[in-house]
């Protein structure tokens, strides 16, 4: 039956071949070989750039008059060959950072063939683009060193004036940037340990406690009295022979590389408020003071300071709380032995400044180290016959020791704040604020590694990255606001149209 049905169906004619025509001697159809590469046309460059292009939105919010006034003293207007417009050079660098182009050389090549880039610079299709060496020389030799910081601050002020910042809570964290240095080319050096910001205050409080305990005061050994024979602590450091300013960054258990660290602060909306660049081997808690002081001096209305576990130190908790702000820090796991009494199992006696163990024995305050750590010890005779000795965690001498910091009460207060609903809510915003800033900077703006060498050049490079990110967010937000206000009259008209009574309803009433 199927065979009969197939035989009854007429054979359809063959489809004509559009690629090969036997009648014309096997020549391709001319309509498919149209070539307009050499066709002369008259076109307006303005019409070639899409209306929704990012550079159009940036051009609408950015002003450059202050740049001309700022850079006017660095140009000669009555002698020599005319120089390149400085705003054009700055725009070329902004293009590089806005679109994540790795180098100025590649940026120069992209601008030559990109119509939108030429429009943004104000150049025509046949105009010669400034060479990338001209841009590099201007930023290295001609322009002032603080220009990148001024560009960053100017864009941040624009966001502030447009009420786009929410600095009620700030988020501080650090991310590493791979340096342009071979990790196999290094040398070991003995370098002096940098003095902490709080070392003087800590030493005074420690010496006060040591005097009460009948101990000798700790002398100043941070290098302030080297002229009088004082000693300064040193440490061995791995120094790159290619870029001595970078530091060895331990990335995981097996990976080590030379890198820089960008310690960054942002607000609730992801706008970068401040950045401090250090070598990769500098701890987050060491560089925290510079970032925190800079941001809070400019935005004193900050109420919450959110950080990760790397910033959970007594000094940071103390400074934030004494500034009448609330530190939001995460839970950190206990690093002691699992089968012994934990520090929170001991009860503190405020009157005697001592601890009472779960077995009912007293641990007295014996000394305070120069690091600010108080040591509490139990009596050997008491612990000798204690039934809890197997789980007590006593040392070889039969003494149970407990160590707390001189500013431990601030860390205890941080733990209480962490458990509040407000604290949990704000800490959960880290993934959409500071972590999002780092993700966008590395994935969209090529901040995963740098070709620059030297701390000053890398710092300027990072500030331009963050300035471009703030400018992009500012332009997109302002563009969306303008669209909203354009649509707003039509919205109210529709509301009046549907809510107003019809003529028939008026007659009935």
Task: Describe these PLM feature segments.
Residues 319, 326-361:
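Phosphate/diphosphate-binding loops
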Residues 282, 380-385, 424-496:
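Basic, amphipathic alpha-helical segments enriched in Lys/Arg and hydrophobic/aromatic residues
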Residues 498-503:
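Conserved small/polar residues in nucleotide/adenosyl-binding loops
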Residues 10-28:
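Short, Lys/Arg-enriched N-terminal segments with co-localized hydrophobic residues
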Residues 112, 122, 130-322, 328-332, ...:
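Polybasic low-complexity intrinsically disordered regions
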